Every structure is written in structure tokens, then in C-alpha cells.
């Protein structure tokens, strides 16, 4: 049927064709009583008036593939036809129809669609554009005015009809269902195979029967390998080796006779000495191992200092300094002059004075005269009322320095005692003056008694030649205090200078 005849038949049947109006008129017909039926495939120069309640008209629905086009009038919606996508081989479907796909609205999607193969014959696809409006695409116009929606088409489609939008949606949904039915069993089989593999991998250990009597098997741990359950070697606690300061038992101690040497010296060890504090409230922070001295069996160690007639081992010392060394890297005294004294008191300390084999270090040739001049006592006793026994260095009147040895010419106000003489101290807490009994050997002089506190001054010793930085660290004193509540060891450097070198005091 010719297009003019179709247009005439549609125009005769259309109510909108009976009225004279154009989509661009400023004033549209008003008070409309009749409306046209919705047309999905309008073709040619036609006009329709739809009711504003028509759902398809509200969506601007059309069977042709139409896209929105720019329009300067905001009240008028302009759409143009895209054409149709067909197979290049003009293949036919099983029902005998031709493949005529609906072109995609988006430009990029339309280009991708053209690169795809024909779903029927897998040949190439091509787009047939619409040129039905004087060489341009057929244009449709939509306008809402009052209670009516006005539609006007310009041009005749010169291409076959594509799939309608409803048909395209139905086809796509069918394809999706088909693909889902194809991939769902495959995914299910993949999941089942993965589950079987997991069961197989875990089945190696699941087939092992459990132990019937686990208590029959004993676990033997290697004692040489440190484990969390086995404590690692650590520093011994101080309260284990704490010496009780019992006055009754302390009075029964007696020193063995001292050993006599031809050349009395002060033997100081090269490595630093460490002392264990007898107070359980402090922990040992010294990097050196703790040395414990047993009164019954004394090993040959480097903790003993031989001072001609007195050898002492200090187990109570400063709680702030777990370890101090008598010899630093330059073999000098570690604390320097001017430093604050380290005076600490402990509740359970013990001062032991007994003989042991001295440690000889040839790098420290320190000696002093063994036979002092008459009238110069070796030890000066000072009696006080605080029951404090301290040994301090006595300042000599003169001292001569040589390359390797400093010798003391005279020791004034000192009493010399034989080297084989033992001494026992009998302190009494907070009572009358204490007496110090000096027990003599069979060949020594009779014991002497000293009332009150015993304050002994040790002789000044000579230190080998060292740099100035180390010589300034050579003035220290030891104060050993005994009281009724405990003992105190004071490592004091507050004494004035007693070494003289080149008319300079150190």
C-alpha cells in the first residue's frame, strides 16, 4: 500500500489530523473531548493527540529506535530515528524472518554492537541509518499542553522495522536465562569438585585413629635446651646469701693469721669487682656476675684487697651501684674527685676480714714502706659515740713520685701492727662504749683493748704513673660502719687531697 494512501487512511482515522495545528504553534487546541489511540509504529507525516493519562505517551514510547535530539524549545521534545542493525549476509532465522536488531542509543554502545558477530550465522553486522526526512533521520516531536499530549512525525522510514523495545527486552532476558542455565550447572560442578579436593586434602589426617591411652606416652624434655617452663640462669637473689648480723655469733668469729709477704703491696684485679647487696628489696642490675663469699670455704678470687695488715671483703655496698670496679680502663680508681659520695646503709650486712691468697697484677706495682719510722703508728684509732668503724686514708706529710712507684717516706700518727695479728670487733648496739679486742698471735704482743668506737685510718698507697685524667680519680676512702641495726659501707671521695705531685694536690 503506498505511503500516501496509508497517510490518508491514518489521517482519516486520526482525530489529531482533523484539527489544524502544528507542534511549533504558540497556542495549541484547547478543551479537547476526543483523543487518539496510542500508535507504536507511527510512519510518515502524521499527527496524534493523546490523553495526558496515557502511560506510553508519558514515556514517549515508540517502536522505532529513537534518540533525543537537541532542541531550542524546552516545551518540545525532539527525537530522531537511528535506523536498524541487520546481518551483512541477510541470513534468515529459523522462523523464516530476517535478523533486524534494534540499534543501541549510546554512540559507543552502537559502535561496539556493529563489531559483534551475527548471533545466527556469526557473520558481521551493519547499521542501516534512517534517511527518511529529506536525507535526514525521521523526526518525532512530543509536547505536553493542558490535558493533552501532542505528537507529530516528519519523514517516512526508509528501512525495515527493528525489534521493538518490548521484543528486545524479552530476547535479552531469554538469553540471560539461557546463559544462567548453562553456567549454573558448570559452577555447581566446580564448587563440588573444590569441595571434594578439600575433603581429600584433609582426609590424610582424618583417617589417623586417635590415641586410645594418651597417658601411656610420656613427654621427656631436653634439659639442656631452654624452654619457657625451665627457668633460665639468672643472677642469684640477694636474700639467699644474706649474712645475719647477730652480735652473739659475731663475737665468736676470729680471724686466721695473716700471711706475710716480703714486699707488701696492694693487689688490685684488672677486671671490675662486683659485690652482692644483702638487701632483698633491691634487684641486681650489674652487668657482671655476683660473687658470693662463703666464710667456711673462700675461693681464690679477685675480690680481696691486701692492705699489708688488713684484708677485707665487702658484701654490703651501695644499692644504687650494683658494681663498681677498682681499676678502670687506665687501671685507676673509677670514682673521681668531686663526685658525690656513695653512702648506703643496709639492714643485713656483714663485714668480713680474713686472709686469702692475694691476686697479683704486675701492671699495678703499688707499694709502701713496711717498716715505718718509730713513733708513727700504722692505724690511728678514733673513739666516737656513734659506734661507727671507718677506715679512711690518712694524709701523709710528704710523698715522692717516680716513674713506676710512689713511696711514702713517713707515716705520722700511725701505729704499726704485726702482719700475723688477727683482730675481732665486738660492737654493742646503742650501749656503753664498745671494746675492740685485738687478739695477738703466739708470737705477737698481748691483746690491747680500745674503748668506744674504732676508727682506723688506712695508710696512703702509691699508684703507678698514669695520665692526668686518671690521676685525678685516685682519692677515695672506705668507711665501714657497724651499728646495732646493721652495717653500712660508704664509698666516699669527700676527703681532701692527699697525693702530692709536682706541688699539686690530687
From Swiss-Prot:
GO terms for cellular component: chromatin; nucleus. Zn(2+) 2 binds at residues 87, 91, 118, 121. Keywords: Developmental protein, Disease variant, DNA-binding, Metal-binding, Nucleus, Transcription, Transcription regulation, Zinc. Zn(2+) 1 binds at residues 81, 130, 157, 159. SUPFAM superfamilies: GCM domain. It comes from the Eukaryota. The C-terminal conserved inhibitory domain (CCID) negatively regulates the transcriptional activity of the protein. This is Chorion-specific transcription factor GCMb. It comes from Homo sapiens.
Amino acid at each position: 500500500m503506498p505511503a500516501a494512501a496509508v497517510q490518508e487512511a491514518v489521517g482519516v482515522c486520526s482525530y489529531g489530523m482533523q484539527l489544524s495545528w502544528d507542534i511549533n504553534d504558540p497556542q495549541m487546541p484547547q478543551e479537547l473531548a476526543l483523543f487518539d489511540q496510542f500508535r507504536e509504529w507511527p510512519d510518515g507525516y502524521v499527527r496524534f493527540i493523546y490523553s495526558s493519562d496515557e502511560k506510553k505517551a508519558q514515556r514517549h514510547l515508540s517502536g522505532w529506535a529513537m534518540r533525543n535530539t537537541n532542541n531550542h524549545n524546552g516545551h518540545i521534545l525532539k527525537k530522531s530515528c537511528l535506523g536498524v542493525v541487520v546481518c551483512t549476509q541477510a541470513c534468515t532465522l529459523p522462523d523464516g524472518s530476517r535478523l533486524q536488531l534494534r540499534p543501541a542509543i549510546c554512540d559507543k554502545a552502537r559502535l561496539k554492537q556493529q563489531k559483534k558477530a551475527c548471533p545466527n550465522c556469526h557473520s558481521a553486522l551493519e547499521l542501516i541509518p534512517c534517511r527518511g526526512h529529506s536525507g535526514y533521520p525521521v523526526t518525532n516531536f512530543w509536547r505536553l499542553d493542558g490535558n493533552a499530549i501532542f505528537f507529530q512525525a516528519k519523514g517516512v522510514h526508509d528501512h525495515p522495522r527493528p525489534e521493538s523495545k518490548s521484543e528486545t527486552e524479552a530476547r535479552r532476558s531469554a538469553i540471560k536465562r539461557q546463559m544462567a542455565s548453562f553456567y549454573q550447572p558448570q559452577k555447581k560442578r566446580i564448587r563440588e569438585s573444590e569441595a571434594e579436593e578439600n575433603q581429600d586434602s584433609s582426609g590424610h589426617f582424618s583417617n589417623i585413629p586417635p590415641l586410645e591411652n594418651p597417658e601411656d606416652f610420656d613427654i621427656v624434655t631436653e634439659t639442656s635446651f631452654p624452654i619457657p617452663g625451665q627457668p633460665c640462669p639468672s643472677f642469684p637473689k640477694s636474700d639467699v646469701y644474706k649474712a645475719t648480723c647477730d652480735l652473739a655469733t659475731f663475737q665468736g668469729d676470729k680471724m686466721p693469721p695473716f700471711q706475710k709477704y716480703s714486699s707488701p703491696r696492694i693487689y688490685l684485679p684488672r677486671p671490675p669487682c662486683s659485690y652482692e647487696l644483702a638487701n632483698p628489696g633491691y634487684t641486681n642490675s650489674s652487668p657482671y656476675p655476683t660473687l658470693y663469699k662463703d666464710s667456711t670455704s673462700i675461693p681464690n678470687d679477685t675480690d680481696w684487697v691486701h692492705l699489708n695488715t688488713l684484708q677485707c671483703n665487702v658484701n654490703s655496698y651501695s644499692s644504687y651501684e650494683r658494681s663498681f670496679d677498682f681499676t678502670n680502663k687506665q687501671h685507676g680508681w673509677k670514682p673521681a674527685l668531686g663526685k658525690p659520695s656513695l653512702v648506703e646503709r643496709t639492714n643485713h650486712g656483714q663485714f668480713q676480714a680474713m686472709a686469702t691468697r692475694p691476686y697479683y697484677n704486675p701492671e699495678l706495682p703499688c707499694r709502701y714502706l713496711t717498716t715505718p719510722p718509730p713513733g708513727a703508728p700504722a692505724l690511728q684509732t678514733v673513739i666516737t659515740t656513734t659506734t661507727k668503724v671507718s677506715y679512711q686514708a690518712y694524709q701523709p706529710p710528704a710523698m715522692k713520685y717516680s716513674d713506676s712507684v710512689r713511696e711514702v717516706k713517713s707515716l705520722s700518727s700511725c701505729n704499726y701492727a704485726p702482719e700475723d695479728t688477727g683482730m675481732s670487733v665486738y660492737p654493742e648496739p646503742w650501749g656503753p662504749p664498745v671494746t675492740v679486742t685485738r687478739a695477738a698471735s703466739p708470737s705477737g704482743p698481748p691483746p690491747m683493748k680500745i674503748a668506744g668506737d674504732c676508727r682506723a685510718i688506712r695508710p696512703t698507697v702509691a699508684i703507678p704513673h698514669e695520665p692526668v685524667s686518671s690521676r685525678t680519680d685516685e682519692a677515695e676512702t672506705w668507711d665501714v660502719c657497724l651499728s646495732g641495726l646493721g652495717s653500712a659501707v660508704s664509698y666516699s671521695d669527700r676527703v681532701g687531697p692527699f697525693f702530692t705531685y709536682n706541688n699539686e694536690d690530687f
